[in-house]
Amino acid sequence: MHRRTFIKTSIAAALAATLASKLGAQEMDAESQASFDTVMAFMGAMGGGDMDTMSRLMADDMVWHNEGDKTLPWIHGDIKGKAAIFEFLPVFSSNLQTTKWENGDAFASGDTVAVFGTMAATATKTGQSTGDFTFALRAKVRDGQVVLWHWFEDSFVVSQAYHGKM
């Protein structure tokens, strides 16, 4: 699968703008603002399928962490390194299509950014929808690049949809 087509979701560049406007009312120090901007740019690039920008914003030693049902082909715990992450993303997007993405809150403190919201997805294997579920993200930034993408979600409902048990 071509890298540019790996992620076809509703997480478009507007995601970054939405979060930025929510956080705009808060005062941030320069490091926090830079970290926030980096994570929002990364999310926007991911949602828009802009692999060049994603690659530029990823540290070579970036870790993507996602726990859950190990029978799901994209759940591996820690995925380490840019190359491994680019191999993982097409597996994820070919199995789960995001159908809804709403951000609730986001904040940044130093090198850490947290994002909280609600999403829904459809498992391509079964066609079953997860319905709405919550997510949280903890990301870390170093020297203008994302070094940690720690994803939290309702992995039970995702597993149920994937295995046709909804």
Place the predicted regions along the sequence by residue:
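Short, low-complexity N-terminal intrinsically disordered segments enriched in polar/charged residues
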Residues: 2-56, 60, 166
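A generic signature of intrinsically disordered, low-complexity regions enriched in glycine/proline
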Residues: 6, 71-73, 158
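A beta-strand edge to alpha-helix "cap/lid" segment located at domain peripheries
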Residues: 8-19, 24-26, 30, 86-166
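A solvent-exposed, acidic/Ser-Thr-rich amphipathic alpha-helical stretch
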Residues: 34, 53, 60-105, 110
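Short, mixed-charge, low-aromatic patches
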Residues: 40-49, 72-76, 92-96, 116-118
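Short, charged low-complexity linear motifs
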Residues: 49-52, 74, 134-137
